[in-house]
């Protein structure tokens, strides 16, 4: 049986908090925009209180490490550090936001090829592709790169087979171009899929010392 896990994500505009306790999952989400610091700790308190779980019962802290906004990723890692130090848990689990969204695609649609296109600014997007193997592991099928819109469009047109699209960058391209892609409308990570990944495979249970986690930012502020 898995231990009690507190998982959260603030890498994009939504604050997402999840709890696994006695094999039951709980989840709350809220649109936070750039106010993650105002919402994250109260939401953690809320999910624990509603489910009658004390902070001291938490065995594992898990969060996303990006790619995401500079402030959002930093806030999540800072809160993870604060809670883990308070509970004397020197290690945390950190997962890519793309893996979290890919796992949601698999859970909801059973599509094993996932393309992430995330807006960086008005003229460029973050691009990466993952494929799920028979063991439930997500394997990179491309490098993570920043592309201008014309180059990204070229890559979309060259895609073979069906890919599920996640991220908020799809609206930068003509809808008729995207017909060969399954648009999932998954534009941000839901932290309950952090717990799904951890539960599914020991590969995703790897814990790290916080200062060794390398965050991935989509911008510099």
From Swiss-Prot:
The keyword tRNA processing applies. GO terms for biological process: tRNA threonylcarbamoyladenosine modification. Coiled coil: none annotated. It holds the Pfam family TsaD. The keyword Magnesium does not apply. It is found in: Cytoplasm. One of its GO terms (cellular component) is cytosol. Required for the formation of a threonylcarbamoyl group on adenosine at position 37 (t(6)A37) in tRNAs that read codons beginning with adenine. Is involved in the transfer of the threonylcarbamoyl moiety of threonylcarbamoyl-AMP (TC-AMP) to the N6 group of A37, together with TsaD and TsaE; this reaction does not require ATP in vitro. TsaB seems to play an indirect role in the t(6)A biosynthesis pathway, possibly in regulating the core enzymatic function of TsaD. Belongs to the KAE1 / TsaD family. TsaB subfamily. This is tRNA threonylcarbamoyladenosine biosynthesis protein TsaB. It comes from Buchnera aphidicola subsp. Baizongia pistaciae (strain Bp).
